[in-house]
């Protein structure tokens, strides 16, 4: 646990399920004030709010689509209005779907880029704007992937969004480091989340993925949440502009680098 995270105001986009849910709950355990963003499922968001409060934190839920500029502006404004400040912005909302690249529609391409990359930019921009205007040494954490560096056949739109996120984060980190604002990525590998549920329910597919992970198992959402808590804490005060891969060594495995996945 990180005592300096108590009462910090943390926004988590896509916070009602998967990695977002795990991170939101973890910050609740840190007794932070958590803003849970969700796009459509209010019931799930309310469940996360309850978990956060039971863990000792405070929480509100805010509906919004990260691809819409006005929704992201409202998200940050609501965090400040309800909790008085903003300390940590976690741009987690993301989508993916497999499509052969020659069959990928522009609509599908735009959906993934707009959610994964543009949404993260908007969240970063609004948070940094608040930090600069209020002289806050704030923290932005973007949810990237091992695929910011490794190609992924059938997922060209997803890989492009995460590759773009890598340089976006590095650029923002360099630009705002003089103001004490830190910007980092988390790069998860294979994690047991709802987005992967169907794939990992198949014993053969699960075993195939596990064979590409040197540590031999598929990660848990809570393991990614631990990375987020570290990056948000003062223990990472000298860390900015990096992608912290939490992948069980997957990015170092030769067969994965050759294009499996």
UniProtKB/Swiss-Prot annotation:
Protein's UniProt keywords contain Oxidoreductase: yes
Sites where the protein binds NADP(+): 11-35
Catalytic activity: D-glucose + NAD(+) = D-glucono-1,5-lactone + NADH + H(+); D-glucose + NADP(+) = D-glucono-1,5-lactone + NADPH + H(+)
UniProt entry tagged with the keyword Oxidoreductase: yes
Keywords, sorted A to Z: NADP, Oxidoreductase
Gene3D superfamilies, per database record: NAD(P)-binding Rossmann-like Domain
Active site: 158
InterPro entries, A to Z: NAD(P)-bd_dom_sf, Sc_DH/Rdtase_CS, SDR_fam
EC number: 1.1.1.47
GO MF terms, alphabetically ordered: glucose 1-dehydrogenase (NAD+) activity; glucose 1-dehydrogenase (NADP+) activity
Binding sites annotated in the UniProt record for substrate: 145
Note: Prefers NADP to NAD.
Family classification: Belongs to the short-chain dehydrogenases/reductases (SDR) family.
Protein name: Glucose 1-dehydrogenase 2
